[in-house]
């Protein structure tokens, strides 16, 4: 038995599919399947109930998966401790980002991070909040950049910046010539939203409910770009995070307006595991990002108005 065997087992437990598990481990399906069988032979116990339709773990298999996750987390800590003995800001770093942050934040910070930390090898992973936090907990990710939510409170949260939400409306909407929109004016309106699983959906829904608005249930988008295109087509209005808003007040059939009284905002933060030996690395990374984004939204909102 070795660490790689445990990684195969955990991957199979996560994906419940041999091919997808093999792909995630960057090996062939026969290789992964063969190693699982060898592990069973070595332990003298069946870990899987083999059926043609799905992967089912035996009780012994489930217990071993739980222990394997613990072992892999400890291995991650050992690697971090070893890394700490060298240069703090060097070597590989796996960063997770949510889809409503990654595409819009990365162009602002990646050039700066490469210049500030040239020896840092960054690997970027995009997924929804619950998936990123699970991967962070298992040790697959080193840190995560997301909108801080209740689920992230179990980790160390380092706030980076507060991001305003802006109203996106189609160009012939009655509000198109306004400079801003009080949140109270949204009362009775129905707004387009992202599908379930996006933390931005829950946050935007909260802002809407407080203002007396509701969700347009005829359509749920998979991405911010889909929302934007639906607004441009005149299918509705929505709230978009400021990083996803262009510098122009109006572009491609969409008008972007600041929301006021109150201004809806979400806090973007960097999250990492408690007790990580590489705390200094994550804190330095957060400080660099915070400095890079300082004042960004003040100037962006002035341009929009």
How should each PLM-predicted stretch be described?
Residues 10-28, 52:
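Short helix-boundary/capping micro-motifs
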Residues 18-23, 30, 37, 133, ...:
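Residues within helix-turn-helix
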Residues 128-141, 146-147, 195-257:
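Hydrophobic hinge/microswitch elements
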Residues 40-57:
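A short LG(V/I)-centered, amphipathic sequence patch enriched
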Residues 152-191:
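Flexible hinge/capping segments at coil-to-helix
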Residues 242-254, 261-305:
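C-terminal effector-binding regulatory domain of bacterial HTH transcription factors
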Residues 175, 190-211, 278-287, 292-302:
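Secondary-structure junction motif
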């Amino acid at each position: 038995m070795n660490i790689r065997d445990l990684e195969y087992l955990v991957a199979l437990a996560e994906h419940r599919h041999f091919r997808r598990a093999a792909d995630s481990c960057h090996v062939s399906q026969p290789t992964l399947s063969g190693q699982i069988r060898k592990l069973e032979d070595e332990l003298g116990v069946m870990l899987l109930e083999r059926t043609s339709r799905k992967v089912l773990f035996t009780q012994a298999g489930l217990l071993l998966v739980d222990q394997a996750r613990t072992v892999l987390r400890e291995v991650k800590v050992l690697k971090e401790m070893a890394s700490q003995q060298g240069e703090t800001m060097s070597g590989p770093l796996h960063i997770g980002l949510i889809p409503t942050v990654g595409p819009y934040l990365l162009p602002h910070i990646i050039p700066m991070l490469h210049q500030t930390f040239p020896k840092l090898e960054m690997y970027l992973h995009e997924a929804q909040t619950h998936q990123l936090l699970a991967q962070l907990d298992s040790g697959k990710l080193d840190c995560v950049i997301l909108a801080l939510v209740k689920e992230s409170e179990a980790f160390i949260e380092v706030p980076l910046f507060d991001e305003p939400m802006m109203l996106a409306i189609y160009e012939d909407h009655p509000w198109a010539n306004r400079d801003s929109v009080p949140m109270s004016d949204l009362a009775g309106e129905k707004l387009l939203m992202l599908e379930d699983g996006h933390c931005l959906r829950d946050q935007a829904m909260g802002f809407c409910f407080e203002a007396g608005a509701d969700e347009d249930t005829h359509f749920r988008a998979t991405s911010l770009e889909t929302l934007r295109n639906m607004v441009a087509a005149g299918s509705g209005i929505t709230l978009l995070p400021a990083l996803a808003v262009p510098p122009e007040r109006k572009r491609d059939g969409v008008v972007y307006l600041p929301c006021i009284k109150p201004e809806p905002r979400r806090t973007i933060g960097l999250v990492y595991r408690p007790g990580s030996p590489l705390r200094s690395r994550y804190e330095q990374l957060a400080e660099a990002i915070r400095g890079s984004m300082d004042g960004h939204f003040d100037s962006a909102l002035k341009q929009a108005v």
